[in-house]
């Protein structure tokens, strides 16, 4: 759809229903779900799905983009409600929870990883920027180190998310996240 033309209210509702139905199917781990099933679940015709998304891959990309949008909007709200180091802690745990929920989604995303889609690079950049914003706020408040970038922290989180294949990984991921946060805290050396 052209970005310059806003959607009518009914078209917006249909698009949102399609994204919601696709997200749920993908999160349920149904990587092979057919667009017909998604359209039926959304209460629209298959033609409506294809008017909004030219291909199944375009639908997958948009679901993922919306997930990233939701994640990357969280830091501003967290900083409004908490001190920067606590906001960072909560955001790190939110990312771990997202990885847990996104386990089924990762199977679906594999289908677009081989394409030249910029969706993953954009997502990485946006998440690194969100982490960088939290780190900068913590550094300005004197509670977090200033020598770690959002990109570096995102790479560390990537390692944590690779634990998903193991039993009880979430508890271990939360412990490692705590260690990361402890390492990021700005510590004033004791006076001699």
Regions found by a protein language model. Name each.
Residues 107-117:
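Short linear capping/connector segments at secondary-structure termini
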Residues 43-53:
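Short hydrophobic/aromatic patch on the recognition helix
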């Amino acid at each position: 759809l052209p970005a310059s033309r806003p959607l009518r209210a009914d078209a917006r509702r249909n698009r949102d229903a399609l994204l919601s139905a696709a997200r749920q199917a993908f999160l349920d781990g149904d990587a092979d779900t057919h667009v017909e099933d998604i359209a039926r679940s959304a209460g629209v015709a298959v033609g409506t799905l294809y008017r909004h998304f030219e291909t199944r891959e375009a639908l997958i990309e948009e679901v993922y983009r919306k997930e990233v949008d939701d994640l990357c909007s969280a830091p501003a709200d967290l900083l409004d409600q908490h001190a920067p180091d606590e906001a960072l802690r909560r955001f790190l745990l939110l990312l771990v929870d997202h990885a847990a929920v996104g386990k089924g989604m990762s199977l679906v995303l594999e289908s677009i990883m081989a394409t030249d889609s910029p969706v993953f690079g954009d997502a990485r950049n946006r998440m690194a920027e969100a982490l960088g914003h939290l780190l900068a706020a913590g550094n300005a408040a004197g509670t977090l180190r200033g020598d770690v970038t959002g990109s570096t922290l995102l790479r560390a989180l990537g390692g944590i998310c690779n634990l998903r294949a193991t039993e009880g990984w979430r508890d271990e991921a939360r412990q490692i996240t705590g260690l990361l946060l402890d390492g990021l805290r700005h510590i004033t050396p004791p006076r001699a």
